[in-house]
Amino acid sequence: MLVEPVSGAPAAVADCGAERALVVADYHAGIEAGLRYERGVELRSDADGRRERLCALRDRVSPDCVVVLGDLVHRIGDPGEGEHDEVEALLDALAVPLTLVPGNHDGGVADAYDRIDVADAGGLRLGDVGFVHGHTWPDRAVLGAKTVCMGHEHPQVRLEDEVGGGRTERAWLRGRLRVAPFADHFGVASEALGWTTPELVVFPAFNDRSGGTWINVEGQSFLSPFLPDGLADDAEAYLLDGMRLGAYRRV
């Protein structure tokens, strides 16, 4: 498996050929300040906790680099002071190269941090693995990978017990991509894409305060322009502990 989830964590290890990458999505540094401004919600900063959790994963899997699938920061535009300090502290602590595939929240990152390798918005391909945030269509080169990793959706499942109680859990979503929506987007015949039916891996949000999309609840809509049409109907959901839930629409 080219992309192997880390058991019990919203992270995976990607085999990129020449190197192994620790991959996470939707870190949302500075989210507490954003929630205070956007919703009037007061939460104590978990900046230290986020950094420690990511560094613990680095120690656990010993990667050559870290890839963030977008939304490293929460504030759209130039990072605020607290957010900037959080990211600088993270870079100091990680001590391995960090690549960011920019998301819709990362507009000011390239100018603010010279220690981050910022990819193009259309994504990045390393070996047989492609990386995108998911808020825009992937580049064709990314779609040529065997496995494509994305964030943006913050997938969650709503689970209910026999007496009507319920809980929400972060989840992975994995399935094959359909060629038709991508051929339509690029304005070419399906054959012209050299389609190899790549697997899509939608990552749970690393930040547990960032909400999410209930992928198994009717009426909840996806955020990405190529979902759900670009994903096979038999795509499956998995919990962070690895439990396979089956086809995500029927969980």
Which role does the model predict for each range below?
Residues 1-22, 249:
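Zn-dependent metallo-beta-lactamase
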Residues 16, 61-62, 142-144:
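Glycine-rich phosphate-binding loop signature in dinucleotide/nucleotide-binding domains
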Residues 22-27, 31-128:
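Core catalytic region of metal-dependent phosphoesterases/phosphodiesterases
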